[in-house]
Amino acid sequence: MDVKSAFLNGDLEEEVYIEQPDGFILGNDPNLVCRLKKALYGLKQAPRAWYYRLDKYLHQQGFSKGSADSNLYIKIENDKLLILVVYVDDIIFGSNEESMSQSFALVMQKEFEMSLLGELTYFLGLQIQQNEGGIFLSQTKYLKQILKKYGMEDAKPVCTPMVTGCSLNANDESAAVHQPTYISMIGSLLYLTGTRLDIMHAVGKVGRFQANPKETHLQALKRIFK
């Protein structure tokens, strides 16, 4: 589900004042200012105010917050379980009981203006496929995007992320390469490890040389993309 104008739901704890809007003069005195009661987009307090507002409401509905992830909420009723994850104004949720999911959607729509987007198929670069066999995650679309970003969409595929017996060291004497690009490539692959556990070791190995990457390190890094 997607919360519309989410930040406008936040209640401000601080005193914040704004100039009177153009065309609106209170009491014919242009020197008066308005005190905000609700957050506005562009206000530095807005994201936090929205999070506190949503967090308070979810606790009122019987949810408890995950200990490892502050954006994860869990609600248990007898043998029924409802789990939801919040990412700013996007909320994904699921339950082992369909009626519990439906009830949650209804109470949320009464409290906030939002739209239901149907069965989850894509979220933060993750493609989600659900069927009777289970729930399957992939990042094919994301992988194509990063291959294009680094000009490697036509690279010849290889069978393994690293050459057998690959030895890399910080004292490599090959030419230095563009550090920001190298770091960016490492970051892109780190996000990919969410579904590609087979490249984690290789990414960790080339990630050791981000402070001073050399051509040899870059070639090893590019191999992982292939």
Regions found by a protein language model. Give the residues of each.
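Long, low-complexity, charge-biased intrinsically disordered regions
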Residues: 1-226
